[in-house]
Amino acid sequence: MGDPAPARSLDDIDLSALRDPAGIFELVEVVGNGTYGQVYKGRHVKTGQLAAIKVMDVTEDEEEEIKQEINMLKKYSHHRNIATYYGAFIKKSPPGNDDQLWLVMEFCGAGSVTDLVKNTKGNALKEDCIAYICREILRGLAHLHAHKVIHRDIKGQNVLLTENAEVKLVDFGVSAQLDRTVGRRNTFIGTPYWMAPEVIACDENPDATYDYRSDIWSLGITAIEMAEGAPPLCDMHPMRALFLIPRNPPPRLKSKKWSKKFTDFIDTCLIKTYLSRPPTEQLLKFPFIRDQPTERQVRIQLKDHIDRSRKKRGEKEETEYEYSGSEEEDDSHGEEGEPSSIMNVPGESTLRREFLRLQQENKSNSEALKQQQQLQQQQQRDPEAHIKHLLHQRQRRIEEQKEERRRVEEQQRREREQRKLQEKEQQRRLEDMQALRREEERRQAEREQEYKRKQLEEQRQSERLQRQLQQEHAYLKSLQQQQQQQQLQKQQQQQQQILPGDRKPLYHYGRGINPADKPAWAREVEERARMNKQQNSPLAKAKPSSAGPEPPISQASPSPPGPLSQTPPMQRPVEPQEGPHKSLVAHRVPLKPYAAPVPRSQSLQDQPTRNLAAFPASHDPDPAAVPTPTATPSARGAVIRQNSDPTSEGPGPSPNPPSWVRPDNEAPPKVPQRTSSIATALNTSGAGGSRPAQAVRASNPDLRRSDPGWERSDSVLPASHGHLPQAGSLERNRNRVGASTKLDSSPVLSPGNKAKPEDHRSRPGRPASYKRAIGEDFVLLKERTLDEAPKPPKKAMDYSSSSEEVESSEEEEEEGDGEPSEGSRDTPGGRSDGDTDSVSTMVVHDVEEISGTQPSYGGGTMVVQRTPEEERSLLLADSNGYTNLPDVVQPSHSPTENSKGQSPPTKDGGSDYQSRGLVKAPGKSSFTMFVDLGIYQPGGSGDTIPITALVGGEGGRLDQLQFDVRKGSVVNVNPTNTRAHSETPEIRKYKKRFNSEILCAALWGVNLLVGTENGLMLLDRSGQGKVYGLIGRRRFQQMDVLEGLNLLITISGKRNKLRVYYLSWLRNKILHNDPEVEKKQGWTTVGDMEGCGHYRVVKYERIKFLVIALKNSVEVYAWAPKPYHKFMAFKSFADLPHRPLLVDLTVEEGQRLKVIYGSSAGFHAVDVDSGNSYDIYIPVHIQSQITPHAIIFLPNTDGMEMLLCYEDEGVYVNTYGRIIKDVVLQWGEMPTSVAYICSNQIMGWGEKAIEIRSVETGHLDGVFMHKRAQRLKFLCERNDKVFFASVRSGGSSQVYFMTLNRNCIMNW
């Protein structure tokens, strides 16, 4: 059978010159559907030989591709392992229709390898058959590769078998892109499960290349298909598989039954780097291919197998007479199987049916004939009976007709009634719909009117606030000018007034100071403070105060005039947490000129009560300046600490700042106090008439994107050198802290280090109100008399604060691992710094079996690194007396005194850790850690960084204070250096298993609020690890605690509404001690929004923004203080081009607000002022949708630069979409969660490992490998504690937490 088309070159082929197939080939039946047409079983008319005929419509666009395919088939199909090309024909069509091209090729009657595998028991071929088929495929590929042709589509469906078990390749070369023999193309790349990684990379990146060795990878996947019934990843969506193939390790055989030769062959074929993959010639010499039984035996075995499978298929198909292809042919044609080579003549099935029909008709005709003959015989025998019979039949027919007519009329009547009922029902529905529509329109009009009214009201409110801001900004400018004019004069007055011999460490302004010597602004502030004190302060009413003047800022402790005079004239303190009896330090920071001050009504009148934390005047070289033991009792025992609110602006405290003391008979201005359990716990009686300062820190885990150097430079300073025999250690502490803080990010106001205005926070400048620029430069110490009794705690409702200054109080930081109770945690000894965790190292070890009285680092003990001086002032935990309640809801008691002045040794507390619900995560069995220990080295000398404690003159009194130790707990104070044991992070988990999946969590004080699929619970981390159910049958997707606002913000419920719960209401659900709170509604919604996907709380200055991602819009709300006390709409951006999945807000250079959001396409920005939306970064190399993980703003960039994390990558860009670093962060695997933690690092949780990386460079700092794959999810973090959850099969979850080494946090 010759080739009907002449052997011409590609350019010379003329499709119109091809012959018509009529009389040469005829079509028998369809065996498959292709994209461009159908594949038929055909037959040569003269010889009866079978052929596969692909019928395609010829269009002008595809004519060149068809010519190229014909040329390829003619050139390279003459090989024993490639289906032979017989010829091409053109079947002419009427004008206006496309002609049909018939491509005639060798017919492989046994079907494809995929068919064979599917019809095999167990869906797996024997190893001998697999080796034989692989060898034949390799021979065909060797032929193609020798002619520089890449098949590009090796898979089971393109490897066909003949009746004699010969193996033939089909659909190679250009045809792989043009069509699929016996199957249609699903996507532009076909099914990707057999594709090599380099081919996929070439689809993603046009610059990538690949060669003929991509066919070797496809051969390896086909071998797995023959062994296991399907290729790897076949249960996934094709686009998902396309994404995973280049990223996953090479697939392997699942079963262990296969020989080593076979597994080695597959491993060799599936080498991911195609340059290392062997060519076909080498694989033909591979033992698995070379060492085979004789070909005859294998082919006989295969033929028997083919025959058996055909018989099975024949039994299934014996009731089917015709076959037609279906659209799902590519999935199901293998099940149907190939028809037998013994052909049914066309029309045979039709003849069979016709024959059966004729037989049936003959049978019925014979029966009718018999009945007619019987009737004639009866008629002849009895004519009268016959007449009667006819009349009877006639009467019966008449009655039947009447009955039929009656039935028809009845049916018509019923149909008419039914139609009437339907019409009435339809009319009623229309009326109901119209009524509903009218009602909805009325409600919509009312809502629109209400919305307009609210908008006008909010607009008027914002205009009033803006006017107040402008007035106070102008007032602040005038104060700055006055201070600049008077600064030199004040310094001269100070030097004249203070003689060297009379210098004291603390300056007391008493009656001897002439008020005329003060600047005008100081007198005005003093006057306002006095008015507030008289009006608001209950202390002022109970105890008359003398009108002692407040000191001006310029009257500081003696310092060299040169360096100090170069300090910017207007400075502001670090934003403190308002509340009663807080120990505050006014760290001054240059105030930017564009700062928008807060309203005067808040900044001048809401002065918080303050206690004094005094600074030494150690910077003066004059020995007379050293304090003497006769220093005022108010100055003793005070603790200096830096407010470590992550949203505050101040740099680290100056080593030598000025200090002022308010006289003990003058009370500061009084404001509504925050009466929480923390505050009441510190109402303790003190010896010497001095009250320990309280340090409470405000924090919000969602807002920790600022430069850590500004927040962590904790300076440890004594109150008085005269009572400080170990003063040298304090100097060492100061040096150590200074060494562990970057000078460029934490400018310290000292004579040797001048403040630089440009060294500002990385987040856009957050200038505070001028209240802090003025009022909080005065650090006040309020003295208490010795006989003053501690105040009892107020009712539970009072524990929650309504202060607008506090974001969330971090009373605990020992995180439940033997930490003090909440009430005592903030006392100076138990906790002198809001970031105690960041300067001490705590390792909680296995809690199961602990020796009795181990004094050193061991299981069940909390080892806190301290210097010997601090040992003296250690305060142990106070038992709160409520053993079954979490600390966040318990009142606190006064500490008891120990006459010996030392903390007595206690029994080992191993059982207590078990009672708290803590177990070892098993850190040495579940997680294998690989950490670069260099990042966890402390930043100072070889000494450990001590916990700041009260020292000095009040140290003896404080040493006598100890707390009732919680039952069984131990705090082991070990002065030896145990850093070597605690350099690496520790992982622990809570024994409690949650029945449903944990979706989110947030720290509420010391305890953890946990949101699951089925409700909200509180995990008591300070007590026995008990779990309290708060809200049931409601899904909680995301949450944040704002303790200062008494709020828990959530996305919850089936409709994903943004709900705000009141913490006082949640607290009362545990205590049940306030009926008034129970009567109130415990939550409210923010707006009428449904379908919230994500939100972010962002604090700028004193404004708290709430940015919310909805289905196709972003809403921005801002917190409005009293009398509104709610989140109010600020901006709305609807009809965004992409659906926001992740959202954040930045303030560029302290001036421009921008919303940054991530979508499935990339990352985008919206300018808040103009509303313009634009793309920041679109990962064009990923053609499928992406999953955005995190938007992280980099430190020291004024909110302009960020790290965008998505999929398993991260890029550094600025807010205008420009790449700023030639670095792409690459995770080791696809993370399920990515989070920025306070140590200036990012963590990624994957199924196989937890990775810790530097946020600045993407450098890998540490890895925790899981012993088994598990799904982990980040929950929240605070200081050096990171909480995450594991989700097991069945939906059960457990809470883990990782304790990072605190020294690494100080070593930025």
Curated annotation (Swiss-Prot):
Location in or out of the cell: Cytoplasm; Postsynaptic density; Cell projection, Axon; Cell projection, Dendrite
Compositionally biased spans, kind Basic and acidic residues: 396-466, 520-530, 702-714, 773-797
Known tissue expression: Appears to be ubiquitous, expressed in all tissue types examined. Highly expressed in the brain, moderately expressed in kidney and spleen, low levels present in heart and skeletal muscle. Isoform 2 is more abundant in the brain than isoform 1.
Keywords per UniProt: ATP-binding, Cell projection, Cytoplasm, Kinase, Methylation, Nucleotide-binding, Phosphoprotein, Serine/threonine-protein kinase, Synapse, Transferase
Ranges annotated as biased composition (Polar residues): 600-610, 673-685, 891-905
Annotated transmembrane regions: none
Region ranges (Mediates interaction with RAP2A): 842-1308
Binding site for ATP: 31-39, 54
Alphabetized CDD domains for the sequence: STKc_MAP4K4_6_N
Any single Gene Ontology cellular-component annotation: postsynaptic density
Region (Disordered): 299-347, 363-383, 395-862, 881-918
Protein name (database record): Misshapen-like kinase 1
Gene expressing this chain: Mink1
